[in-house]
């Protein structure tokens, strides 16, 4: 929820992915880190999960390799090799300052609790 907030350390490409169509396509993969985790499907995941891809090394070898590859790709302007972790709720992300997001979530929770109380 907080990654798109300006206070987060997420880079612009990660924020854009979370707020765009990429957030609608997540997958559980070992490709990025060597451990199962859910991320937005990008070039790295697509290549790593292709049928002819080599086996993924265990953590931390896979994660260290991904980080090095991502640094090199970013240096050439390619954001498709980043670990862009995201859960199934990623499409619900909203870009706003963290304080505003907390206030919005608090108000939404209060509204949902009131609606629930009205039907129970």
PLM regions: where:
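Conserved active-site-proximal phosphate/metal-binding subdomains
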Residues: 2-120
